[in-house]
Amino acid sequence: MRLSYLSLALAIIFVLTIMHASNVEAKASADPEPDAVGSINVKNLMDMIREQITSRLKK
């Protein structure tokens, strides 16, 4: 009889844990690095310059 109470208690704890976990939200604890955004812009700029140079060399 005790085993059934134990399994019932574990099942209730499991269900309550799942129900509580759905209310938890993840939040960022740090700001993004300022260099990360800048390096993306530099990469795009370098790609544009490379395309311009190659298109002018083909003419």
From Swiss-Prot:
Keywords: Antimicrobial, Secreted, Signal
Subcellular compartments: Secreted
Region forming the signal peptide: 1-21
Main location: secreted
One Gene Ontology CC term in the entry: extracellular region
Cleaved propeptide residues: 22-38
Tissues in which the UniProt entry reports expression: Expressed by the venom gland.
Pfam families: Pilosulin
InterPro entries with a match to the protein in the record: Pilosulin
Biological function: May have antimicrobial properties, like most ant linear peptides.
Assigned protein family: Belongs to the formicidae venom precursor-01 superfamily.
Protein name: U-myrmeciitoxin(01)-Mg5a
Organism name: Myrmecia gulosa (Red bulldog ant)
